[in-house]
Swiss-Prot record:
Origin species: Treponema pallidum (strain Nichols)
Record keywords, A-Z: Coiled coil, Membrane, Signal, Transmembrane, Transmembrane helix
Membrane topology note: Single-pass membrane protein
Domain of life assignment: Bacteria
Protein name: Uncharacterized protein TP_0222
Membrane-crossing residue ranges in chain numbering: 125-147
Amino acid sequence: MWKRGVGALLWGMVLLRSFVAYADSQAATGGLLKEIMGEVASIRLESNMLKQQLRERHAESAALKKALQTLDVKLEKAAKALEESEHALSESKELIETLRSELEILRQRVNALNMRLRRLEITNNVLIGVAVVCGVAAIGAGIYAAVK
């Protein structure tokens, strides 16, 4: 928009100069007219340079906008990946806590089973001892009955 304004302003200056040049040309010499035409040419050259710079800035702006969009997409992907990893980490922590509590319960059960096993081994040893004593007593009773 401002490019059009600058262009219109420059053309207005050219037209103003040409009207002034026309009015002065009748009274002025040919050298003055050449000087004015040189000014017009320099203004046109400057206008063209400004237009070229404006085109270059638009190209740079478009490239920067594209780069910004690319970075924005990458940022969104990174944020989504971070959110997913945080969620996975949270789930992993919950699973670890659950496994720890289950492991503690299993340890308690193993300890209880070990205690029962020890009691059963002791009871078994006592019963084996009683059986041996009973066997010896039965053999002794059999021998006593046979001798009698």
